[in-house]
């Protein structure tokens, strides 16, 4: 009966069915023709794997190998890669970074690339509001020294509450502890003292990152043509929406209260800066400002806590590093009257090198400098990059290139410390010490953890200070090692171009005697 009914509908509406079929056919033909025209100048990696769907699945399970193989095979040329994106994705070698960096935002858009990667069409996270970068660049970075004492106060409280006071070796899920610690100290900067210690706030801030990641992964697993039809049904996306509502319900009353306050009475934090910046960057509704805050939590808490976990896993696997790092901390603090400040943290060169080497071998992303192409342009080698394409730079492959980093797969904690000490004679006869270019927060063509150019991560200075503060206090108070029976550093988990430390693993720690 159902078949007969369907047949009758087709007969009765034959002209509608024919028109729809023609439109769909035309759209498919145009899409295929655009794809053919746009990729005729771009060789693809992984073609031996077979169909586009097989290549997409290979990207989800082993993007690292695809980026590495493409980087080695094409080296100085652009190549295509089939990813989870609905758009053509081209991978650009670092030699083109300067010329790409000179292109205006009307040609290459960082925010639209972020929207693509975060599946914003379906997640509705709206993490590309320009007020975010304005507030971080214009207020946060300039305020770090001023907020240093407040951050340290929250850190001390969090460490005393969350880390065990153990005289014997004790197993700890350090990933869970670090997520909460980072949420507390970042929260002091983002939402101020009234919220940063609140269980409701911390629960919302920590879990929004988990649920956003799960939703993006779940959507990305679907073939692109199925996403418009099936994404809304995904339980991960529903969980994200519910969590977004909870975050907004926590932030909304605080925002309403802040708006009613006199400007001079408002606390010195990101909430206030965003409210104040509306004069320059346009009015936002309370709902939009809550979404902006949510975006900040996604960007800051998840990534920083993962970097911290990677650092702790490295220390647990290589406890022989601890005495040298601890001695540097002791020496530097003695020289700065025992004060942990931005200045004293910057003086801890070996600790800085350890973090940079951690990020080199265990970056949060396998690709960097993502940009959406808004207008077709031609590179200096003649390769045409079409409008609509998504650009990536194979950062992890670059950072493990033996031509750039000797013995690149070996973790050398003081690799960048040694480079900082090297002196180079410049053309004018002056001496240059390679300090700044090899600092953890520095971004250059060979070190792309924080991106590159004018859109490099504006929050990297806060992240660096937080990571160093956590390690300074921990290393002065605790010993650390892997679990008994474990002899190698825990492997990271990877999906597509995302890489995270395994959050289920435990390490052992005990109070320093």
Swiss-Prot record:
The keyword Iron applies. Keywords: Glycoprotein, Heme, Iron, Metal-binding, Monooxygenase, Oxidoreductase, Signal. Residues 1-19 form the signal peptide. CDD domains: CYP503A1-like. Gene3D superfamilies: Cytochrome P450 (1.10.630.10). Its EC number is 1.-.-.-. GO terms for biological process: secondary metabolic process. Pathway: Mycotoxin biosynthesis. Glycans are attached at residues 37, 139, 173. Pfam families: p450. Its cofactor is heme. One of its GO terms (molecular function) is oxidoreductase activity, acting on paired donors, with incorporation or reduction of molecular oxygen. PANTHER family: CYTOCHROME P450, P450, PUTATIVE (EUROFUNG)-RELATED. Cytochrome P450 monooxygenase; part of the core atranone cluster (CAC) which products are predicted to catalyze most or all steps of mycotoxin atranone synthesis, starting from geranylgeranyl pyrophosphate (GGPP). The initial cyclization of GGPP to dolabellane is probably performed by the terpene cyclase ATR13. The Baeyer-Villiger oxidation near the end of the atranone synthesis, which converts atranones D and E to atranones F and G is predicted to be catalyzed by the monooxygenase ATR8. Of the CAC's other predicted gene products, the reducing PKS ATR6 might synthesize a polyketide chain. Belongs to the cytochrome P450 family. This is Cytochrome P450 monooxygenase ATR2. It comes from Stachybotrys chlorohalonatus (strain IBT 40285). The gene is ATR2.
């Amino acid at each position: 009966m159902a078949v007969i009914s369907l047949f009758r509908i087709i007969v009765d509406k034959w002209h509608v069915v024919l028109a729809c079929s023609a439109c769909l056919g035309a759209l498919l033909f145009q899409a295929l023709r655009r794809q053919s025209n746009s990729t005729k100048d771009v060789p693809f990696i992984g073609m031996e794997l077979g169909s586009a769907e097989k290549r997409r699945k290979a990207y989800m399970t082993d993007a690292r190998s695809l980026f590495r193989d493409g980087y080695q095979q094409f080296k100085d040329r652009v190549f295509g890669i089939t990813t989870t994106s609905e758009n053509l994705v081209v991978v650009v070698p670092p030699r083109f970074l300067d010329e790409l960096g000179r292109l205006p935002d009307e040609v290459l858009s960082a925010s639209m690339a972020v929207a693509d990667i975060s599946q914003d069409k379906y997640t509705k996270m709206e993490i590309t509001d320009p007020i975010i970068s304005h507030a971080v660049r214009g207020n946060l970075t300039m305020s770090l020294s001023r907020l240093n004492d407040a951050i340290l106060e929250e850190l001390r409280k969090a460490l005393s509450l969350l880390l065990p006071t153990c005289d014997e070796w004790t197993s700890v899920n350090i990933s869970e502890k670090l997520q909460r610690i980072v949420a507390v100290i970042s929260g002091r900067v983002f939402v101020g003292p009234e919220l940063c210690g609140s269980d409701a706030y911390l629960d919302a801030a920590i879990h929004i990152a988990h649920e956003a990641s799960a939703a993006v992964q779940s959507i990305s697993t679907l073939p692109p043509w199925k996403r418009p039809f099936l994404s809304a049904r995904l339980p991960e996306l529903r969980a994200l929406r519910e969590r977004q509502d909870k975050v907004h319900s926590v932030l909304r009353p605080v925002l309403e209260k802040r708006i009613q306050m006199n400007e001079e009475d408002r606390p010195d934090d990101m909430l206030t800066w965003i409210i104040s910046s509306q004069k320059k960057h346009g009015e936002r509704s309370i709902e939009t400002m809550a979404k902006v805050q949510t975006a900040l939590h996604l960007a800051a808490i998840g990534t920083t806590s993962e970097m911290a976990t990677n650092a702790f896993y490295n220390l647990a696997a290589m406890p022989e590093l601890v005495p040298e790092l601890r001695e540097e901390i002791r020496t530097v603090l003695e020289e700065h009257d025992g004060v942990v400040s931005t200045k004293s943290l910057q003086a801890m060169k070996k600790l800085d090198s350890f973090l940079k080497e951690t990020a080199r071998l265990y970056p949060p992303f396998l690709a960097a400098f993502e940009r959406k192409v808004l207008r077709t342009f031609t590179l200096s080698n003649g390769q045409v990059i079409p409008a609509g394409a998504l650009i990536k730079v194979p950062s992890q492959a670059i950072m493990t290139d033996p031509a750039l980093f000797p013995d690149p797969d070996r973790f050398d904690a003081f690799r960048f410390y040694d480079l900082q000490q090297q002196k180079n004679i410049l053309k004018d006869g002056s001496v240059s010490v390679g300090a700044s270019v090899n600092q953890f927060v520095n971004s250059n063509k060979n070190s792309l953890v924080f991106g590159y150019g004018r859109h490099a991560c504006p929050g990297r200075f806060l992240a660096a200070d937080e990571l160093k503060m956590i390690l300074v206090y921990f290393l002065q108070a605790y010993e650390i090692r892997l679990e008994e029976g474990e002899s190698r550093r825990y492997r990271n988990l990877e999906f597509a171009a995302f890489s995270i430390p395994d959050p289920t693993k435990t390490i052992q720690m005990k109070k320093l005697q």
